[in-house]
Amino acid sequence: MEMQQNCSISCFWETQPLGCVKISCIFYHSKPRNINGLFLPPSSNTTLQKESQEGSPPPTQSQEPLKPMENVSRPIHHPLVLKTNFEEEEEEEEKPNDASSLWTKTPEEIEEKRAIKEMCYKSGEYYRFHAPPDIPSSKSIAPTVEKELEKPLENGSELQEGDGLTVPTKFSLFERAGEAKTSLDRKPRTDIAAFENGGGDCYAPQRIIFLGVDESEALAEDKETTSKGSNAKEESKNGLHPKHPLTARLVPTTHVLNATENISMKCRENPSSMNDVQPVRKPHFKGVKKRKWIYDEPKNFPGSGMRRAVHIPNPKHKMSYHHHNKNRNAENASYTHAQRDAVRTVTLNAPPRSRPTSGSYNKADVNKDPKLNLCPDKHMSTSYNGSAWRRRIPFSKTYSKTEKIYPEPRRNGSK
């Protein structure tokens, strides 16, 4: 009954400019309504009476499903649209910022910013900054910077002088030939590196001294030294110190080896010098095997006992070594003592050799050196016998091949 009374009452919202927007409004509406595209005709008493006669439950059932629709589809205010694409929002936000910055910046600030961008682009790819296309000057500068960076790598100019280990990566054939000539004409590499690589093989001053010698002068000087050999014994008896001929002879030995090695290098560098160097190369290959022993001699064995016997040029004493070597195992320990005395007398017969001048690094010395290098091998068996020395000295040590030559005779050579 209340429903019928309510239906006779006109709706208040109908007098408002927007009209009644409630779909389930039970009041009377004299005007048609359009709510979110849904057209509702004006209300009539007949329909309302039928609804009231059917009972109250149907209108309640119709109101229940319509209430959630009121909350969703009834736009009282303007609709708020939510965007899910965030990239477009960022772009839209940046555009007004740029527009505002253009308005606020003065021309001086714009020019300053452009200059900073050019400087950053010139500094290289370290900053990873790419200039905008509206700057033509930066494009012209970029290729020139790349060319300047590539030039030192192609020419090898960043390599230090005197560094023989680094090799330039890119070279033409003409540049390689020029580089080889200039490196040969320059001063030699550091002497320290030469000693580390095997003992002064690339020492250029020795090679120059050796090549400047005349053969006739070298042979004449060698004859003079051999003629003085007969007076060596008398001079030694008169009180000549035995170390003088030794030290004067040891130094040229190492220099001659260096000179022969440098001459072989000179032959490879300049083929025109083969005629002067050819007779020297054959004895060089014979003496290479004993090179390590010759270099180790002055620093490991400073004593004068057995070392002087190495440089004996007299062939008669070599024959006596062969004779002692054959009868060595058949004799007793007293014979070894007598033989050491014989070795000391042999060293007194050695001709005294003074240190030659710069011109005496000649080819005659080179030819004699291989013969001198053979002496230690023959003398090694006479100077050391393992069984005999162990009988005499129970606490003696065993030595390697290079150490068997000197330590025992130097320790027990004197009475």
Swiss-Prot record:
<feature type="compositionally biased region" description="Basic and acidic residues">
    <location>
        <begin position="365"/>
        <end position="380"/>
    </location>
</feature>
<dbReference type="Pfam" id="PF15663">
    <property type="entry name" value="zf-CCCH_3"/>
</dbReference>
<dbReference type="InterPro" id="IPR040943">
    <property type="entry name" value="DUF5571"/>
</dbReference>
<feature type="region of interest" description="Disordered">
    <location>
        <begin position="39"/>
        <end position="77"/>
    </location>
</feature>
<protein>
    <recommendedName>
        <fullName>Uncharacterized protein C12orf50 homolog</fullName>
    </recommendedName>
</protein>
<dbReference type="Pfam" id="PF17732">
    <property type="entry name" value="DUF5571"/>
</dbReference>
<feature type="region of interest" description="Disordered">
    <location>
        <begin position="220"/>
        <end position="247"/>
    </location>
</feature>
<feature type="region of interest" description="Disordered">
    <location>
        <begin position="346"/>
        <end position="415"/>
    </location>
</feature>
<feature type="compositionally biased region" description="Basic and acidic residues">
    <location>
        <begin position="400"/>
        <end position="415"/>
    </location>
</feature>
<feature type="compositionally biased region" description="Basic and acidic residues">
    <location>
        <begin position="220"/>
        <end position="238"/>
    </location>
</feature>
<dbReference type="InterPro" id="IPR041686">
    <property type="entry name" value="Znf-CCCH_3"/>
</dbReference>
<dbReference type="GO" id="GO:0016973">
    <property type="term" value="P:poly(A)+ mRNA export from nucleus"/>
</dbReference>
